[in-house]
């Protein structure tokens, strides 16, 4: 339509590009935000505080879709709170990732045929720092591409001097309190890395192994013997007992006796233990306390010897047998072969599918191994972490995750914190020449000649201090006074028990520290965060977990390049719900990009027609359409606020999507076109209403899709930046229920006319002569011009002859629609089209009914699949009926 807008609005429209090209504007726009200081937090501000610490990604890594989800949700929260008038600190940083980083650098050295030992510890650590300085910036660049509104002036790294000081302080406090100790216990051992690794670094995979049943004791059936089965036959070199259930009658007479070890010759006892399942296998279990976690516990209960039979590289050692020096997998074969030669192998099953823990870093099977390590005594720490949630000091969203939290913290085992690495926080323990041991805090110097413990701390130890160490603890700082406790932690439920638990334990341990309580309400407990929001895992569009082996992973940077950061962010936020997994694929990204494009085109149309926010005219002078869209805006604002406050990102995005697309663009913009063509006052008020609603929609959408909304909002309002614009608030006006009812009736009438037109074979844009009977009874007189325009109807002339009619039942009356399609439709062509459509519908009906009548299919198919087929069947049946009726109608002509 021809624009009646004033010239300045056309200038504002010209400020926008012809079409939205994210790659042309996003990078420059982001740097403008950073340069303007919008993301820099001011601890001296009088505004209420809102703070989030970014879960630190590994310095070795790049952002995957899980990171992109985390960052999108955190940025959404931070941007919204900033618009609501809060002083926002979103603090970024990276984790030094001990094992991962050391492995990367060692692999680089290996290319030149070098090892870390060739350089020595000090020089190797310096090489790691060099690598970090050269390669550590990739993640920051990716965060900028995503649009993360973080305070770059406070960027932290877990090996920074300040954070290292915090780590040493916490270690000494725990050590002095008797909560850190050294002991020989079973750990997950990586022979390739030659270090203990944490549970979270172990992934369990099904492998094709072997199950070997072997005979202890006499080879004569009438003399004492037992049969045990194992998937790791080499570990029998470290067996120190055979366990049976105390009530198993088969072994009652053997309990307390000994049998000769088939290879070492030592006598090993038969012990009774309730752990053994008498129904499984032979009911007898070989016990290798130094190389199996369950066997270790049995060994403790029965005071068994615990010889370690493998060295740090996974080679057999100290057994006094011909197998010493062999790799564990070679020994597995050789031990089995010897036992077979001696007639002790009773049965072999291969392949035998069983689950084996693998190192996430190297891919090798981990080896449970008895090792001297440093441990944290967690009982009191874990109780405090659990109580913080029980007492409501920390709230988990969704609440359905609370039982998992309590199950974990209430049953936590002591935590091994030492790692046999060179890169990381060195354990601050020194040993004297006569066996003395001292723990030193920051700034303390060891006596001359004392040697520091060679191990480093588990990465989770330093990242467990992240919420407060990043703000300057153990010093009292303005940041801690203003922004601690942090407002919310956003993370996936899959690491709830690892990183989150560590932060909670440490945070509660120092909750009464003067550095954290200074300037605070004495009654306020200094928890690390007030809320924990747990989202689910990202799956592909078919609901399968993303993994390298499946090849179904998505690089978020690829999506940013293809669809723009806004489309990526909207896809992730729209699918996010508390505790629930979300499935994403290209169709979702395309839909989000279409939404961004729709918003861009709608704003450009509004600008071309002079739309601008301003003081709204008196309600009495507004049309039903105006009052309806303004009232709906209030309703959607309330829905969006409630959803965001409850961390229901998906619900907020759905509300905004449907309001912006279905109601604002598809309905109000079309109604506005009719109003723009009216007299000057009506057109002007329409411009103000459209501008006001669009202004609010852009502000509401900004936290999720910041780039396009910034460009559009500045063009629409001429404001500085939507980043610092005020969050919309409710108008306080009582909604007009009558206007809403009339608009709903008009929408139903237009929709039914469009459907009826289609049934008559009319093209979408083809106008047709029509009569609407009963419009006055339905109170739609004022909307009649809009109904005619949107339904593509023209006024009936003197030659009007109705060829088809339909009755549309509305809320208070029935409107009859008569159409004159004579000369508008090629009846023969329409008949052929309908016959083709009928054949397709009949085929779909037959296919779906066939599946639903197949008992074998119904027995195997998932319920959701069957439901989808039922829906398809119902749709096909309705289509067959509708098309058949239309063909019958054509046959009567």
Curated annotation (Swiss-Prot):
Motif 'KMSKS' region: list the residue ranges.
545-549
Q: Which reaction does it catalyse?
A: tRNA(Val) + L-valine + ATP = L-valyl-tRNA(Val) + AMP + diphosphate
* GO BP term, example: valyl-tRNA aminoacylation
- Keywords on this record? Aminoacyl-tRNA synthetase, ATP-binding, Coiled coil, Cytoplasm, Ligase, Nucleotide-binding, Protein biosynthesis
Q: Which CDD domains is this protein grouped with?
A: Anticodon_Ia_Val, ValRS_core
Which residues of this UniProt protein bind ATP?
548
Which principal EC class is assigned to this enzyme?
Answer: ligase
What GO cellular component entries does it have? Answer: cytosol
* EC code: 6.1.1.9
- Major localisation: cytoplasm
UniProt motif 'HIGH' region: location: 57-67
Return the Pfam families for the record. Anticodon_1, tRNA-synt_1, Val_tRNA-synt_C
Where would you find this protein in the cell? Cytoplasm
**Coiled coil location:** 821-855
Q: Supply the NCBIfam families for this chain.
A: PRK05729.1 (NF004349), valS (TIGR00422)
Which family is this sequence assigned to?
Answer: Belongs to the class-I aminoacyl-tRNA synthetase family. ValS type 1 subfamily.
Q: What does this protein do?
A: Catalyzes the attachment of valine to tRNA(Val). As ValRS can inadvertently accommodate and process structurally similar amino acids such as threonine, to avoid such errors, it has a 'posttransfer' editing activity that hydrolyzes mischarged Thr-tRNA(Val) in a tRNA-dependent manner.
HAMAP family for this protein: Val_tRNA_synth_type1 (MF_02004)
- PANTHER family the record matches: VALINE--TRNA LIGASE, CHLOROPLASTIC_MITOCHONDRIAL 2 (PTHR11946:SF93), VALYL-TRNA SYNTHETASES (PTHR11946)
> What does the UniProt entry state concerning the protein's domains?
ValRS has two distinct active sites: one for aminoacylation and one for editing. The misactivated threonine is translocated from the active site to the editing site. The C-terminal coiled-coil domain is crucial for aminoacylation activity.
Subunit details = Monomer.
- Indicate what this protein is called per its UniProt record: Valine--tRNA ligase
Native source species? Nocardia farcinica (strain IFM 10152)
Lineage of source species: Bacteria, Bacillati, Actinomycetota, Actinomycetes, Mycobacteriales
In the UniProt record, the gene name given for this protein reads: valS
